[in-house]
Design a protein with these regions (language model features):
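N-terminal secretory signal peptides and thylakoid transit peptides that target proteins
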Residues: 1-14
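Blade-edge beta-strand/turn elements of extracellular beta-propeller
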Residues: 43-61, 68-69, 128-141, 184-206, ...
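Beta-rich, blade/repeat-based domains predominating
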Residues: 69-80, 144-155, 203-217, 296-311, ...
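Loop/turn-rich, solvent-exposed surfaces of beta-rich toroidal or solenoidal domains
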Residues: 319, 352-389
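C-terminal segment of N-terminal export signals and the immediately downstream linker at the start
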Residues: 20-57
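Blade-level signature of beta-propeller repeat domains, shared across WD40, Kelch, NHL, RCC1
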Residues: 409-445
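Beta-propeller blade signature
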Residues: 119-128, 178-189, 234, 329-333, ...
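Beta-propeller domains
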Residues: 46-75, 81-133, 175
């Protein structure tokens, strides 16, 4: 099954889910796909994978880059681009705060603290598409804070998101010279540091991720707060976000709170009618944009994080949503002009063995969702979790290190999955028999 097939497969799957309510049950038994099989312990102690899958480390913290700096830490969201001439570019976020090391001084950046450019931003990793050997590495954006996730655009750029709405006179803002909490755009074709221009019209908040509908040019944005909302940006000029536009928030008819924390406001397989409410004062100097949205009827989401675009739809991870607060995945279906969009609760975890605090999300070559876990416990056991179109979850990989996996993305040919080990930074390339999925399910208690 390929990515396009996910649409057809999910239609029948959602019907079955709505009938059975399989993932809305209060008990802890559930069905799980066998998937790619048992995870094989990694002798290097990094990443357990199913038999037949392998990984290689292509970039690590401290590696020398061509601009004289070294690879920074805290690698997070990431996108993969085809540069042509047999080259790929990975544009990689680094979720650095002012006290972190930048990997070396740089002269062009957005903001400073106490006169020194803050270390967050992006790096480029340019690869040979066949050998996956690194041809170049360099910093491509600087002077930002906590670049968490982002998203690719149809015109070949990476939207990198600051998960930090801080600035002068604000919490954590001592010594800063500018407000932060913006989205920045980095062309995949960049060859060095780009001029950092915040896309102010896309709002100031705890940005997490973004995705662009190629059919309309609309941008969908998540916010990592326990009382967040989902945003939509309508650009004045599709394909040119710098020209400004209109920011809106998602309102689900009759459901002001999608989190399912205090009751089942939306069952798995159920859907609601969506309207989009316009927002004002989107630069939000008091970091109150979500409050403005909620006051206008926008529906609350529990920590909106990963978002991935499909054909006419987007999948959104709510990290701590659900009755067990283990995570939800929503499916937003876009409708033609004059009709209302719809949002459907595709998945809600009832067990840590399904997934526990899903973060980044991507569609795999077989059409399944791949979710990166980011657990908030003293000892973590983070996995990559697959979710098949029938709603069954399975383990794809297990990280053996005490950190998270982030930024999962696939090469344009679908043969390689790239993923980051957050800290200490490692960027991995995973290959294997992506078409060998076993759809058989088992019941787990």
């Amino acid at each position: 099954m390929r990515r396009r097939s996910f649409l057809a497969a999910t239609g029948a799957a959602f019907t079955a889910l709505a009938t059975s309510g399989a993932y809305a049950r209060a008990d802890t038994s559930f069905s799980r796909s066998i998937g790619y099989g048992t995870l094989v312990p990694d002798p290097k102690g990094v990443l357990d994978l199913p038999e037949g899958f392998t990984y290689r480390v292509i970039s690590s913290l401290g590696d020398a880059m061509s601009d004289g700096a070294t690879v920074p830490d805290k690698a997070d969201g990431m996108g993969c681009f085809d540069l042509g001439d047999g080259r790929l570019a990975l544009v990689r976020n680094h979720e650095l705060v002012p006290r972190d090391s930048s990997g070396g001084a740089f002269e062009l950046g957005f903001g400073a603290k106490d006169g020194v450019l803050v270390p967050g931003g992006t790096t480029h990793v340019v690869l040979d598409q066949k050998s996956l050997k690194v041809k170049d590495q360099f910093r491509s954006l600087g002077g930002t804070i906590r670049n968490c996730s982002g998203g690719i655009t149809p015109w070949g750029s990476w939207l990198t998101c600051e998960e930090s709405a801080t600035g002068p006179g604000q919490k954590y803002g001592e010594g800063l010279d500018k407000n932060h909490g913006w989205v920045f755009e980095v062309p995949a074709t960049a060859t060095g540091l780009v001029d950092p221009k915040p896309l102010v019209a896309m709002g100031r908040f705890n940005h997490e991720a973004a995705c662009v509908d190629p059919a309309t040019g609309l941008v969908y944005l998540t916010e990592d707060r326990t009382d967040s909302v989902l945003y939509r940006f309508i650009p004045r000029v599709p394909g040119d976000l710098s020209q400004g536009g209109r920011l809106q928030a998602m309102k689900v008819e009759g459901i002001p709170d999608l989190r399912n924390w205090t009751g089942m406001s939306m069952a798995v397989g159920a859907a609601g009618k969506v309207t989009w409410v316009d927002l004002d004062s989107v630069e939000a100097p008091k970091d109150d944009l979500r409050y403005q949205a909620a006051a206008k009827g926008a529906s609350l989401v529990a920590r909106g994080e990963g978002i991935h675009m499909g054909e006419g739809e987007a999948f959104v991870c709510s990290t701590s949503g659900g009755a067990r607060k283990l995570g939800q995945i929503f499916r937003i279906q876009f409708s033609p002009d004059g009709e209302s969009d719809r949002v459907e609760l595709f998945f809600e975890s009832v067990s840590k063995h399904q997934f526990d605090y899903g973060d980044n999300v991507v569609v795999a070559p077989n059409g399944h969702l791949i979710v990166c876990e980011d657990q908030y416990t003293e000892v973590v056991d983070n996995h990559l979790r697959g979710i098949a179109p029938d709603g069954n979850a399975y383990p794809l990989a297990r990280l053996r290190l005490q950190t998270e996996l982030a930024g999962a993305c696939f090469s344009p040919d679908g043969q390689t999955m790239f993923v980051n080990v957050y800290a200490p930074t490692k960027t991995l390339a995973v290959t294997g028999p992506w078409d060998s999925f076993n759809a058989k399910t088992i019941t787990v208690s």
